């Protein structure tokens, strides 16, 4: 939905449309940022902000390295626009944890404030931010800026970080940080000849020890790996996965198991959830995921991102399902020679196993209430962000770009230890996002309550928990006009 109080960019800013939408990425720069940008810049171009100093603010995720990189790299952008366009810019960074960031952004945007000029949004928030007209629709911006007309690594990038509604051509975000689930593995354990011999003797199979081994690994055999390395008397467990009620921590691995096993979470076209989420396949996925707690350290039902980092870097687990974006925290100077990052296991019936894991990552979105100057800087910043030099520098600092040129380069796999797994999991059909619906927050809160109730033992019946979630989410979407059917009569009798 366009903002009725904000006409199409170019007219609303009072700047000639051709000037306003002229991209900052048409210089055709090459090389790496290590050599100063200014040595390769063309003569200064006419710009409506020439001679001015603009202060900008980015709102991002607290404690999340990729979020802060935009601001940490902003002096490079300042050099770029100072030499090319003749203006100065400085960036401040406001932040909030994942669980609080949406509310912080929404509270500000609802007042039409330009407190945060550019926001790093979680991907599922696109609908909630776009529908009220709080963020800028980017189709026209992209059309007029060749530097933003990138070839993305896969369709998954567009579907996850850019489009709302799903399946439409409306673009509201641009990828800031790409992210996929990866399995971090203790290379020092799986490459140990004594461990390999013991595993072979116990299970009559090779201990998976290479990227290719894990590429072909199914959940049944992965469970053997977890079991083998679960040695509480030695302070070692087989795995760490996320089970926490905070934000989406339990949801992401559980949805991944459901999808990979052949389950679905809703019908996006009709908004139908009851009868889809609460299926037998998804019930079995719930039961399997809970059963894996025996391979994890005590307290694993409270594990989120930070808790996994702690037990991993302390050497307490042999494997860990974690986001690729957390690579710099997971791989430290002390353990970097002992870690490999690989695709997580496949699920499903023998011979038909597959992996479809939850996407992570965040898009940039632009505040629709920015004044003319800040809107222009935001567009210039986006053009700069997707320059080849910037994307490569971002990767070198630990970020995950999403464009095909950067990710397809010969050097990319070797830049970070997780890059190969990240690319693998970004291939079509291997990862996907879940709802971009404006009711995302309410739906997530309800299911996190239900999922963790079962994982902690408060609720004993997996199918009953799924019925509770499905009925509640069906009501949420029916009340919002998204679902065509109201919850069935059965829903009147469900509870945790």
Please provide the spans of the model-predicted regions.
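Extracytoplasmic "Venus flytrap"/periplasmic binding protein-like
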Residues: 79, 83-156, 193, 311, ...
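Glycine-centered hinge/linker elements that transmit conformational signals in sensory
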Residues: 221-230, 257, 261-302
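Long, aromatic- and glycine/proline-rich binding clefts that accommodate carbohydrate-like moieties
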Residues: 38-46, 50-53, 155, 161-164, ...
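Short, solvent-exposed loop/beta-turn-alpha elements that line the ligand-binding surface or hinge
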Residues: 49-51, 140-153, 197-202, 206-214, ...
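Hinge/lid segment of periplasmic solute-binding proteins
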Residues: 46, 123-184, 250, 340-344, ...
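Short, polar/charged alpha-helical segment
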Residues: 64-88, 447
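N-terminal secretory signal peptides
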Residues: 1-15, 42
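Extracytoplasmic/periplasmic substrate-recognition and gating elements
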Residues: 2, 54-60, 84-87, 165-169, ...
């Amino acid at each position: 939905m366009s903002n009725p109080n904000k006409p199409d960019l170019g007219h609303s800013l009072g700047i000639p449309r051709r000037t306003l939408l002229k991209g900052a990425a048409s210089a055709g720069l090459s090389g790496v940022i290590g050599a100063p940008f200014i040595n390769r810049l063309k003569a200064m171009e006419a710009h409506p902000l020439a001679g001015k100093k603009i202060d900008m603010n980015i709102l991002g995720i607290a404690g999340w390295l990729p979020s802060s990189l935009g601001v940490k790299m902003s002096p490079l952008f300042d050099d770029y626009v100072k030499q090319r366009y003749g203006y100065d810019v400085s960036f401040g960074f406001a932040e909030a944890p994942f669980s609080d960031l949406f509310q912080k952004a929404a509270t500000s945007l609802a007042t039409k404030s330009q407190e945060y000029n550019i926001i790093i949004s979680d991907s599922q928030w696109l609908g909630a931010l776009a529908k009220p007209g709080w963020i800028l629709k980017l189709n026209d911006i992209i059309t007029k800026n060749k530097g933003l007309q990138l070839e993305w690594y896969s369709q998954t990038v567009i579907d996850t970080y850019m489009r709302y509604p799903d399946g439409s051509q409306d673009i509201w975000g641009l990828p800031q940080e790409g992210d996929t689930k990866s399995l971090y593995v203790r290379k020092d354990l799986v490459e140990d000849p004594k461990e390999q011999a013991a595993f072979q003797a116990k299970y009559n199979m090779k201990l998976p020890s290479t990227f290719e081994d894990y590429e072909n690994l199914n959940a049944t055999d992965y469970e053997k790996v977890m079991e083998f390395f679960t040695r509480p008397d030695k302070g070692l467990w087989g795995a760490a996965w996320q089970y926490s009620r905070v934000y989406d921590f339990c949801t992401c691995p559980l949805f991944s198991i459901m999808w990979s096993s052949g389950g679905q979470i809703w019908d996006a076209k009709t908004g139908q959830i009851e009868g889809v989420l609460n299926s037998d396949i998804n019930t079995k996925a719930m039961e399997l995921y809970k059963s894996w707690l025996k391979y994890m350290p005590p307290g694993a039902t409270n594990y989120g991102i930070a808790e996994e980092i702690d037990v991993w870097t302390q050497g307490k687990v042999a494997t860990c399902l974690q986001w690729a974006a957390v690579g710099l925290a997971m791989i430290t100077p002390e353990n970097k020679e002992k870690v490999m990052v690989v695709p997580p296991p496949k699920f499903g019936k023998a011979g038909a196993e597959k992996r479809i894991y939850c996407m992570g990552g965040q898009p940039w979105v632009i505040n629709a209430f920015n004044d003319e100057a800040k809107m222009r800087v935001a567009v210039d910043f986006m053009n700069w962000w997707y320059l080849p030099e910037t994307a490569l520098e971002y990767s070198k600092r630990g970020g995950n770009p999403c464009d095909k040129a950067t990710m397809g380069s010969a050097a990319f796999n070797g830049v970070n230890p997780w890059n190969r797994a990240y690319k693998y999991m970004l291939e079509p059909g291997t990862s996907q996002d879940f709802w971009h619906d404006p009711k995302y927050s309410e739906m997530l809160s309800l299911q996190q309550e239900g999922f963790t109730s079962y994982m902690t033992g408060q609720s004993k019946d997996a199918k009953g928990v799924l019925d509770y979630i499905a009925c509640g989410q069906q009501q949420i979407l029916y009340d919002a006009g998204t679902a065509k059917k109201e919850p069935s009569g059965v829903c009147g009798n469900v509870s945790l």
